[in-house]
Amino acid sequence: MSQMQIKSILLPTDFSENANHAIKYATSLARQFSASIICLHVIEPILPSVGYTGLTEPLPMPDLSEQLEDSAAEELPKVVGCKAFSNLVVEEIIAHGDASTEIVRVAKDRGVDLIVIASHGRTGLGRILFGSTAESVVRHASCPVLVVKPEQANES
């Protein structure tokens, strides 16, 4: 069996604390294999809520979409600019669509060798209501996927 070669790693981020912990795994592997990293943030479609009374005046959808785009464009360089990424080749991508679908698409289009993704560790009703992006990526990706669970993140 030939030695495993990892030249490119896809690191999806939603800017959460869990996603930040996956950085340790991705950057460590990138250093070990002299691999590049693609740091990806996916902006999911906004579905207007019906009957939500938390806002006195709802934001118009184009304004909210623009805010999400601006926020991602501001946050992604901050993530990639952290010390963990020093001396690594890193590309930033912002995509639009369903998170798991876009992660799998970018991985395939870019020919990445490994996806390192954080799991939020939801179970029960939370998982039913919100789904599992990591689980969907594992099921549909054509390359290996390393899932960093919240417990693993806290141990490292």
What is each PLM-predicted segment?
Residues 1-4, 32, 80-115, 152-156:
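Structural beta-alpha unit
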Residues 2-58:
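Small/aliphatic-rich secondary-structure junction motif
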Residues 26, 79, 103, 137:
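Aromatic/hydrophobic pocket-lining residues that form π-stacking "cages" and hydrophobic walls in ligand
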Residues 40, 91-95, 146:
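General small-molecule cofactor/ligand-binding pocket signal
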Residues 58-74:
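A short acidic, glycine-rich active-site loop
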Residues 69-85:
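N-terminal Rossmann-like dinucleotide/flavin-binding domain of flavoprotein oxidoreductases
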Residues 71, 94-98, 120:
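Short beta->alpha linker loops
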Residues 105-156:
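Gly/Ser-rich helix-loop-strand patches that form or flank binding pockets
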